[in-house]
């Protein structure tokens, strides 16, 4: 039933072989565990960074407090030549640098993306002015208010006419988006400015 090995040399070789196989298995298991730990650490840091970016996109937004347009009469037609948005930080937002933001303008006859220009608003750029706070282009405190100025007369053909609307989407440096529909009133007669 049992076979007895009487030769001592054969017994030692079997024991050493088993020991070598065992050590090899332990080494393979240790290497595999190291790879798994490194992979888990990498995935954890990647997931944490992704979570922070997603959180920033959700929380670091602006709120549009109000919007108005300047009315200009040219050739007997009243149009809105400048569209203005008053903005502030959303609750819990970090500093928002409007000079690193973009505004997508989708209007009656034009679709374009506006970028920041510190000196003037034109067909491709918007500018900002401080209403309340120390910065003309960065929202630092919840109480800060900044006016975003867009040259509607340069962006569209002769400005926005009565009854027209434009979709404005402000994208901050964090990637968060705020959309506002600016609706021009049906009548602009005898007005210098109108709520949009």
Swiss-Prot record:
Q: Name the keywords, alphabetized.
A: Archaeal flagellum, Glycoprotein
How does it get modified post-translation? Glycosylated.
Q: Which GO terms describe its biological process?
A: archaeal or bacterial-type flagellum-dependent cell motility
Is Glycoprotein among this UniProt entry's keywords? yes
Supply one GO CC term from the record.
archaeal-type flagellum
Question: What residues make up the propeptide removed on maturation?
Answer: 1-12
Which is one GO molecular function term here?
structural molecule activity
Keyword set includes Cell wall biogenesis/degradation: no
Q: Where in the cell is it found?
A: Archaeal flagellum
Q: What does this protein do?
A: Flagellin is the subunit protein which polymerizes to form the filaments of archaeal flagella.
Recorded hits in PANTHER family, A to Z, give:
FLAGELLIN B1
Name of the protein: Flagellin A1
